[in-house]
Amino acid sequence: MKIWIDADGCPVVDLTIRLSRGYEVFLVCDTAHQFNRAGATTITIGQGHDAVDFAIVNRMAPGDIVVTQDYGLAALALARKGQAIDQNGRVFTNENIDFLLHTRHVGQEIRRAGGRTKGPKKRTRQEDASFEQSFSRLLTEKTD
């Protein structure tokens, strides 16, 4: 099992690496975001719409875990029989991904029509704790 991090804008890169001891961890980013972290291999992809997402999906295997806040990438990871988790500890499942994709679509339609939608709130320690708990549970389930 490998851990794939959609590293562009991911606030839990260091936390994920720390929790993933004993597993291969890959940070995938585009040329506008450079990462070099001990305990992880960095894969840099050329810039392009969804280039990082497709790079992860094309490299991952069934059973791998993807850390992403991108619902589209999460859906692709699930389709490849992987698991996906966001930076706040929400585990994406076949049961919740359709609703999340629909919510994203509605937000895009509102913005295209000139409307505004809420942006993300400031990150809290509780979100880090939630991520740590959920991610640790995923790792434990994989080793049982």
Swiss-Prot record:
Disordered: annotated span: 110-144
Name of one Pfam family that matches: DUF188
Top-level taxon in the UniProt lineage: Bacteria
Bias (Basic residues) ranges: 113-124
Family annotation (HAMAP family): UPF0178 (MF_00489)
Family: Belongs to the UPF0178 family.
Protein's UniProt name: UPF0178 protein Exig_1155
